[in-house]
């Protein structure tokens, strides 16, 4: 049976419902339309979302590109500014270097001119001497001929007589000429030496430090004083025994004074006491522990200070023990001048002067840096600091030139090389130029008082005034009891007393004043 026959039978049968069939057909059509519409709507929504996503992506890409462009422009501007700064710095350095070169060229030109003038003067003097010698020879020949004609003396006797006569006549002139040449040469050398020293001094500047023998430690409260002292004073006794300092506790609010002439001990005590106060546990066991830590910190600080000084001067090849001992000079002072700073300054001055006179600046710099290293050695070694320092650096492989320069910088031994003289000169410049060193106020007042007292102890002195920071003393004597000759003797006597009994850094000018005043009143 075919499908058409089957459909016909169904349609003819009573079971077939046309309304249901039509409904199914309409429902299927509507379902198809709904599915088609939904699919179309879905596709349209997908297209719209895709377009929106594409637009968002395009905008984000544009924003990212703009950010990248701005960042690149900022980096370019920063690089350009950095290059401009570097260019400006290099231009300034080039200008400074050019000025230095021009100044050096001017100095060389001046030296060339001075040498030319000296050579011309020498040539003129040589020509004058030759002319004088020729004139003397001609005169001698003429006199000899005349004498041979009128005398029975032989030629040798006449020659000897003429030689003695001419020698007597020319001796004074030659001596005066020699003195003039030597004075001019000495003056030129002094002028050049003064120029070199002034140029070296102007390139460095130093400031005095405070030469203290005590250190103040602040306390958080007054109760801490009792904890530092401890029961029956056991804590403070243990602290003083471990550090070797004196701890002074008085009525000063919230302060403790640490006193010691050894700056390293004083610094160790300060660090240990501050650590104990911060920790809060103060008893003999912790005191020993914190003092040991403070010693280690001081050793590290000294090593770092030595390395900084060596790096600053660009010196290579120093033994670590030398660097360590050199760093300890950081804690020592001489007339308010830090010894490590003084050593660095001496090294720089010696290097500059060596460069000016054509010597090796590195050798001079090395010797200048190490010249006072003996001051950092403890008191177990005997001898002056120059001798101790020379032996110490010899032990660690320094060259004989440097060793002799250190040993001879106070002229305790004979300088063997010119570098020893350079170190002496640089050390003197660093120590005595204005502002480099200064006495403590108490020592300054005491020295002025002793100076005036020495003058007042001489018979006939009425008043004495120390002026110019102790570099000059003016003595007023009684004109009734002191004559002019006695005033001169008083000046000499006071000079001898000052040299024998007083220590002073430079020179002291002595002025004795003897004057009489006569007053009349007209009525």
UniProtKB/Swiss-Prot annotation:
<dbReference type="InterPro" id="IPR006675">
    <property type="entry name" value="HDIG_dom"/>
</dbReference>
<dbReference type="InterPro" id="IPR017705">
    <property type="entry name" value="Ribonuclease_Y"/>
</dbReference>
<protein>
    <recommendedName>
        <fullName>Ribonuclease Y</fullName>
        <ecNumber>3.1.-.-</ecNumber>
    </recommendedName>
</protein>
<keyword id="KW-1133">Transmembrane helix</keyword>
<dbReference type="InterPro" id="IPR036612">
    <property type="entry name" value="KH_dom_type_1_sf"/>
</dbReference>
<comment type="similarity">
    <text>Belongs to the RNase Y family.</text>
</comment>
<dbReference type="InterPro" id="IPR003607">
    <property type="entry name" value="HD/PDEase_dom"/>
</dbReference>
<keyword id="KW-0694">RNA-binding</keyword>
<feature type="domain" description="KH">
    <location>
        <begin position="213"/>
        <end position="276"/>
    </location>
</feature>
<dbReference type="InterPro" id="IPR004087">
    <property type="entry name" value="KH_dom"/>
</dbReference>
<keyword id="KW-0540">Nuclease</keyword>
<comment type="function">
    <text>Endoribonuclease that initiates mRNA decay.</text>
</comment>
<dbReference type="InterPro" id="IPR022711">
    <property type="entry name" value="RNase_Y_N"/>
</dbReference>
<dbReference type="Pfam" id="PF00013">
    <property type="entry name" value="KH_1"/>
</dbReference>
<feature type="transmembrane region" description="Helical">
    <location>
        <begin position="18"/>
        <end position="38"/>
    </location>
</feature>
<dbReference type="InterPro" id="IPR006674">
    <property type="entry name" value="HD_domain"/>
</dbReference>
<keyword id="KW-1003">Cell membrane</keyword>
<keyword id="KW-0472">Membrane</keyword>
<feature type="domain" description="HD">
    <location>
        <begin position="339"/>
        <end position="432"/>
    </location>
</feature>
<dbReference type="GO" id="GO:0003723">
    <property type="term" value="F:RNA binding"/>
</dbReference>
<dbReference type="GO" id="GO:0006402">
    <property type="term" value="P:mRNA catabolic process"/>
</dbReference>
<dbReference type="GO" id="GO:0005886">
    <property type="term" value="C:plasma membrane"/>
</dbReference>
<dbReference type="InterPro" id="IPR004088">
    <property type="entry name" value="KH_dom_type_1"/>
</dbReference>
<dbReference type="Pfam" id="PF12072">
    <property type="entry name" value="RNase_Y_N"/>
</dbReference>
<keyword id="KW-0378">Hydrolase</keyword>
<keyword id="KW-0255">Endonuclease</keyword>
<keyword id="KW-0812">Transmembrane</keyword>
<dbReference type="GO" id="GO:0004521">
    <property type="term" value="F:RNA endonuclease activity"/>
</dbReference>
<dbReference type="Pfam" id="PF01966">
    <property type="entry name" value="HD"/>
</dbReference>
